[in-house]
C-alpha cells in the first residue's frame, strides 16, 4: 500500500482545473477518519495523510498522482508495466531486474509514497499472484482464498434465503454466477476474473452449486445458470448474449416484475418514477453485495 501526500489536493496544473473541482478534491482528501475500535463515543480525527479507501474518487486520485510514473515505465520497451490502483506488476528480463527495481523504488519515494514491505519478486516460471489471479507458465487461475470466498458466498445464499422464496434465491444465485450489466458497466465475480484460462475451476464451481442444490433438496425447483457457460458468453458473445442480464435493456414492465415478484415490493398505485428509483436503488445494493466477493484482492 502507498500513502498519498496531500499535495495532490492542490494540483500543480491548477491553471487548467476549475477552483471548484480542486476544492472538492481537497475536502474529500481531508475527510474525517474514524479511530477504531468504535466505542460509545466515536472519536474522529482529521485525516492528515492518505486518501480514504472506498471514496468514489480514490482511484482517480491515484491515477492522477501516478500518471508520470505510469507514462515513464510504459514507454520502456524492455519491460511490461501494469498498475491497478496501488498494485504494480513489472515483467522484466533478469539482467535488467535490479536496475528497474531501484529506479522505480526511487521514483515512487520521490513522490512521497511508501512502498509496502510485502513485495513479491521472482521468476515468471514460478507461480505468482496479482489482483487475486495466480499466474504461472501453464495457466492463469484464481487464488484459493478468492475461490473459497465465492464458494462461501454462494452457500450463504442457500442458508439464509427461506425456501418459500425460491424465486429470490434463483435470482440472487444467478446474479452471483453471471454478474450483470448496469449503466454500461459490468459487475460480477466472473467479469473480474474473465482473464483466467483454468476452465477446470469453472467446472468445479458449477459442481459446488449442484451439490448445494442437492443438499438443500431443491432439485427441479430452481433453474440455475453455469459459470462455464457464462465464461463462454463473456468471451464470445457478450454484446449479443441474453444469458448475462443487461439491465439497461429492461423495459418498465420488466423492472416492475422484478421488484414485485422477486423483491416482493408492493407497487400498487406507484408511478414510473417510483419504479425507476426503487429498481436503481435495489440494483446498487446488489452491486455492493457482488463486489464483496472480490474485495481484498491485493
Outline where the language-model segments fall.
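A sequence-level detector of short, solvent-exposed, charge-rich linear segments
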Residues: 23, 27, 40, 44, ...
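A structural signal for alpha-helix termini and helix-coil/disorder junctions
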Residues: 6, 10, 14, 27, ...
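Conserved polymerase palm-domain catalytic core
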Residues: 1-85, 89-103, 113, 122-127, ...
Amino acid at each position: 500500500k502507498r500513502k498519498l501526500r496531500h499535495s495532490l489536493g492542490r494540483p500543480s496544473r491548477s491553471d487548467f482545473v476549475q477552483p471548484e473541482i480542486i476544492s472538492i478534491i481537497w475536502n474529500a482528501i481531508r475527510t474525517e477518519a474514524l479511530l477504531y475500535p468504535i466505542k460509545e463515543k466515536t472519536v474522529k480525527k482529521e485525516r492528515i495523510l492518505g486518501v480514504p479507501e472506498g471514496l468514489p474518487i480514490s482511484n482517480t486520485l491515484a491515477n492522477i498522482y501516478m500518471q508520470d510514473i505510469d507514462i515513464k515505465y510504459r514507454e520502456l520497451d524492455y519491460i511490461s508495466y501494469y498498475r491497478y490502483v496501488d498494485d504494480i506488476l513489472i515483467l522484466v528480463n533478469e539482467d535488467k531486474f535490479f536496475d528497474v527495481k531501484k529506479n522505480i523504488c526511487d521514483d515512487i519515494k520521490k513522490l512521497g509514497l511508501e512502498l509496502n514491505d510485502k513485495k513479491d519478486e521472482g521468476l515468471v516460471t514460478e507461480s505468482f499472484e496479482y489482483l487475486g489471479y495466480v499466474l504461472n507458465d501453464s495457466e492463469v487461475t484464481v487464488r484459493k482464498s478468492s475461490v473459497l470466498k465465492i464458494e462461501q458466498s454462494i452457500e450463504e445464499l442457500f442458508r439464509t434465503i427461506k425456501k418459500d422464496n425460491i424465486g429470490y434465491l434463483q435470482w440472487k444465485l444467478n446474479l452471483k454466477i453471471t454478474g450483470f450489466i448496469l449503466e454500461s458497466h459490468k459487475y460480477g465475480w466472473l467479469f473480474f476474473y474473465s482473464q483466467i484460462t483454468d476452465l477446470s475451476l469453472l467446472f468445479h464451481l458449477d459442481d459446488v452449486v449442484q451439490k448445494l442444490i442437492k443438499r438443500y433438496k431443491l432439485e427441479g425447483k430452481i433453474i440455475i445458470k453455469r459459470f462455464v457457460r457464462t465464461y463462454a458468453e463473456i468471451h464470445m458473445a457478450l454484446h449479443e448474449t441474453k444469458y448475462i442480464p443487461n439491465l439497461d435493456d429492461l423495459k418498465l414492465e420488466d423492472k416492475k416484475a422484478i421488484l414485485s415478484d422477486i423483491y416482493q415490493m408492493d407497487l400498487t398505485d406507484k408511478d414510473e418514477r417510483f419504479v425507476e428509483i426503487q429498481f436503481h436503488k435495489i440494483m446498487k445494493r446488489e452491486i455492493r453485495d457482488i463486489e464483496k466477493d472480490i474485495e481484498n484482492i491485493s
